[in-house]
Amino acid sequence: MASAPVDPRVCSIARTLDIVGEKWALLAVREVFLGNRRFDEMVHRTGAPRDTLAARLRTLVAAGILERRQYCEHPARFEYHLTDAGRDLYPVILTLMRWGDQYLADDDGPPLVLEHRCGHRLVPQVICQACGDPVHHGESKTAES
């Protein structure tokens, strides 16, 4: 039997997508993870329209995902840094990257390969925090909170 529909106003996925569900928002977060914290770097590396990227950065700052830090007074210039909430998006970014690498990479392979500190290629997976087993579709169910 299917579960009851989830009210989109109280769904954590819908709420999250309201903030990061737009292409330029997640690409801005990706850039900060990669160490590109300045607006002009982000515009150059993402190809985002300046006004659109500026709007997404304002949203991410207002949501507490990024924070602005001034690095130059004259003229005033800012860098963007991840907050704890922003750093918690790292598994999301990695999982999206893994999916894209698996289903959308061209013949040359993925455009960016990450290596774990152990020296092996990083292949992220979702695991159960309690038992450490990988989590697969169909192995979880909704529970009362």
Question: Could you describe each region identified by the protein language model?
Answer:
Residues 29, 37-42, 57, 89, ...:
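Extended, folded domain segments that form the structural surfaces/walls around functional sites
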Residues 1-8:
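N-terminal intrinsically disordered/low-complexity leader segments
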Residues 11-52:
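N-terminal helix-turn-helix DNA-binding core of bacterial DNA-binding proteins
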Residues 101-145:
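C-terminal regulatory/oligomerization modules of transcriptional regulators
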Residues 21, 72-95:
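Basic, amphipathic "hinge/linker" alpha-helix immediately C-terminal to the N-terminal HTH DNA-binding motif
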Residues 39-71, 75:
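Canonical helix-turn-helix DNA-binding module
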Residues 45, 79-81, 113:
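Short aromatic/hydrophobic contact patches that present stacked aromatics
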Residues 26, 63, 92-103:
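Alpha-helical linker/hinge and terminal dimerization helices associated
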